[in-house]
């Protein structure tokens, strides 16, 4: 157990702390004020004294006779620019002794009550660093100055800075009217900063600091009181927690006692239930024994052993009342016997399940065989249908072939007759030419009129002869093409013998391109003959390929067993 401090001990510790150590000033509070005799320069006064240091490097220029100029100065220390009223580029007018006035661009910075100006190149440095250089081009103090806006000869937006102590007024020009107004407001507000205002501000700051110190001390005292009260409340809370813990422990012990009593009661009830279960198990075993005796003769020997065990169990049941451990042992023996019987029943069930699975397999095989027979019947019907279609088509092709052969014979006879006529016409033309040449000078005029017509007739007959020769050669070309197509089909069908029927049908459709004769009866004889010759070879070969593939498949069906036979995909 941890030792607890009483409120009296806490008060004694606090008093000893107060006596031993003086009160420290607050960390976040304002700094302590110095005695009234010593005057410290802070805030605006310090910045003014810094700005009146020897930055201009001139001894005789007394711009202001305020006490800030008589101080020690802080020229060596130059911190960051904490506040700048305005800055920017303005035009400054300057005039030397015997020369005309000129305007020059300068970078001006308004810091508190001083207007500092640099060269224009310093603008980038100032915007980056935000620090004032210790060596400017010039400094203009604005305390007590009068600032007026107006215009000059060349410039309109001008500002005039005048002071009785300055030798001449300073003129500055802005780029537009807006910047002029902005600079005018900033400069006039800067002229209001003076020594009196700074002194008043310092006194107000000191008063506020003193008030802050008093408030911090009061705050400390209140915090100490609150800490003491909080500690007292914490102690009371700790005591209450301890009491609650003790109460919880007592309740836990009470619950434990209740649980133990419940467990004992449950154990007694379980013992009673176990005894009842043993009696019930005995009855069930007797019933099972009677049923097994009636069912099978093989189990009679086992039932006799069970009867012997039953007598033993009766003896053991009498001992159970005296000893609980013996009852458990007897229960285990009975459970083992029951397990053996259950195992035998499970063996019978497993054998029955095996028979059922074999029966299902046989049924599935029968179904598979029936499906295969149906598929084969469909394939046979499909092949018969295809063969009948091909036979019909072959009949049509044979009729077309007979027609083409008769037409070819007629053409050959017509060609021979045309050749004979051409020969007779050529002989007649030769006789005419000879007769015309044999005539004398009297027939010159007739020759001039007749000879061109004779030449034209001769050219016409020569063209007809060439066309007849070309048609005679065309029949030989067609025969050669038919033989070549037959050889290609022989090779292709030899490769397609082992493939399925779908591949064979696609090949026939792609290569035959068979069109029935009835669809296009008005076609010319030449194209009809060419298509008929092409059809004949493809259809003959397709019929042979279908017969050979059908024979191979029927042979494979008869030779191979039906379980390993792959079904044809129609």
Swiss-Prot record:
Biased composition (Basic residues): 542-551
Domain PH: 83-192
Keywords recorded for this protein, A-Z: Coiled coil
Name of the featured protein: Pleckstrin homology domain-containing family D member 1
Organism from which the protein derives: Caenorhabditis elegans
InterPro entries documented for this protein: PH-like_dom_sf, PH_domain
Record SUPFAM superfamilies: PH domain-like
Family assignment from sequence similarity: Belongs to the PLEKHD1 family.
């Amino acid at each position: 157990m941890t030792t607890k401090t009483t409120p009296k001990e806490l008060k004694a510790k606090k008093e000893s702390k107060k006596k031993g150590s003086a009160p420290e000033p607050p960390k976040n509070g304002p700094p302590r004020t110095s005695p009234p005799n010593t005057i410290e320069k802070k805030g605006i006064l310090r910045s003014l004294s810094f700005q009146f240091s020897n930055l201009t490097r001139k001894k005789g220029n007394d711009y202001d006779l305020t006490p800030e100029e008589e101080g020690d100065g802080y020229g060596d220390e130059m911190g960051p620019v904490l506040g700048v009223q305005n800055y920017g580029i303005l035009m400054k007018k300057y005039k030397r002794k015997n020369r005309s006035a000129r305007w020059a661009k300068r970078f001006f910075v308004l810091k508190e009550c001083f207007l500092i100006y640099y060269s224009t190149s310093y603008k980038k440095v100032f915007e980056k660093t935000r620090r004032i250089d210790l060596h400017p081009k010039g400094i203009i103090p604005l305390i007590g100055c009068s600032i007026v806006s107006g215009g000059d000869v060349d410039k309109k937006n001008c500002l005039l800075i005048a002071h009785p102590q300055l030798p001449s007024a300073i003129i500055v020009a802005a780029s537009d009217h807006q910047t002029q107004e902005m600079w005018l407001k900033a400069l006039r507000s800067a002229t209001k900063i003076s020594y009196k205002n700074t002194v008043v501000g310092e006194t107000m700051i000191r008063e506020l600091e003193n008030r802050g110190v008093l408030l911090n001390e009061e705050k400390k005292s209140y915090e100490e009181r609150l800490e003491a009260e909080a500690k007292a409340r914490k102690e009371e809370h700790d005591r209450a927690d301890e009491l609650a813990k003790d109460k919880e422990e007592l309740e836990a012990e009470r619950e434990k006692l209740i649980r133990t009593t419940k467990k004992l009661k449950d154990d007694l009830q379980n013992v009673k239930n176990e005894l009842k279960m043993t009696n019930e198990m005995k009855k069930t075993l007797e019933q099972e024994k009677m049923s097994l005796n009636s069912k099978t003769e093989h189990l009679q020997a086992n039932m006799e052993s069970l009867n012997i065990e039953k007598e033993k169990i009766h003896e053991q049941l009498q001992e159970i009342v005296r000893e609980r451990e013996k009852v458990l042992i007897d229960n285990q023996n009975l459970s083992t016997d029951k397990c053996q019987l259950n195992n035998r029943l499970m063996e019978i069930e497993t054998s029955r399940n095996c028979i059922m699975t074999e029966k299902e397999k046989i049924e599935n095989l029968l179904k598979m065989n029936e499906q295969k027979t149906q598929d084969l019947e469909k394939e046979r019907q499909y092949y018969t249908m295809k063969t009948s279609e091909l036979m019909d088509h072959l009949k049509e092709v044979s009729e077309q072939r007979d027609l083409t052969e008769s037409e070819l014979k007629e053409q050959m006879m017509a060609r021979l007759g045309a050749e004979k006529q051409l020969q007779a016409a050529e002989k007649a033309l030769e006789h005419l030419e000879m007769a015309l040449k044999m005539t004398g000078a009297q027939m010159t005029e007739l020759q001039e009129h007749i000879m061109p017509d004779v030449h034209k007739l001769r050219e016409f007959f020569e063209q007809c002869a060439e066309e007849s020769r070309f048609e005679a050669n065309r029949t030989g070309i067609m025969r050669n093409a038919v033989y070549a197509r037959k050889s290609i089909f022989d090779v292709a069908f030899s490769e397609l013998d082992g493939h399925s029927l779908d591949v064979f049908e696609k090949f026939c459709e792609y290569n035959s391109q068979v069109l029935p004769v009835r669809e296009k009866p008005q076609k010319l004889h030449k194209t009809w003959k060419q298509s008929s010759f092409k059809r004949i070879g493809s259809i003959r070969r397709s019929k042979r390929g279908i017969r050979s593939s059908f024979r191979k498949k029927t042979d494979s069906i008869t030779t191979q067993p039906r379980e390993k036979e792959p079904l044809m995909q129609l």
